[in-house]
Regions:
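Bacterial N-terminal signal peptides
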Residues: 11-21
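Bacterial N-terminal signal peptides that target proteins for export
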Residues: 2-13
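Flexible, surface-exposed loop/linker segments and immediately adjacent secondary-structure boundaries
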Residues: 25-69, 73-160
Length: 160
């Protein structure tokens, strides 16, 4: 007859679990609350660079501050941010979501897009309506302070 192994968790293990489990849950909540928008429409191929990894995206994919979106050839992406800003990217385009804040209750507004190459249609949302000075669109040649409601932009690839 074999002896049964009885496991009694140590106090250190229980203390570690009490600290770690709420921290892990808070981390998951913060990931959800850091979503700044989503991919509403996708045709062809597209990817997002998040950190150092490029991964394919699909319609409905969440977007985060710091993401870099790339469309393939052929490819097109429609993006909607949480303030109702809409951005359409044409084939062979690249855009970085550099800065974003939309917290009307705290009067926190920021929108900084870096359009790297390709074609874009941009329709402003609530950030421009509530705090026009908080929105900027950067291109390789200029920075645009957005005050209107619609922009169409074409950026050719830089030749060295």
């Amino acid at each position: 007859m074999e002896a049964a192994l009885i496991y009694k968790p140590s106090s250190a293990f229980l203390l570690a679990m009490l600290v770690c489990v709420p921290a892990m849950a808070a981390n998951e909540t913060s990931k959800t609350s850091d979503i700044i928008g989503h991919v509403q429409h996708l045709t062809g191929s597209a990817s997002v660079v998040r950190g150092s990894a490029a991964v394919p995206i699909a319609a409905g994919a969440p977007l985060y501050q710091g993401d870099v979106l790339r469309t393939g050839k052929p490819g097109a992406v429609g993006v909607v941010l949480t303030d109702a800003t809409t951005i359409s990217m044409g084939s062979g385009s690249e855009m970085a979501l550099n800065d974003y804040a939309f917290a009307p209750k705290d009067s926190k507004f920021a929108l900084a897009l870096k359009l790297i190459k390709g074609s874009f249609a941009y329709v402003t949302g609530q950030i421009v309506k509530l705090s026009p000075e908080s929105a900027q669109v950067h291109t390789p040649d200029a920075t645009i302070a957005v005050r209107g409601t619609k922009l169409l932009i074409q950026i050719d690839e830089m030749k060295e």
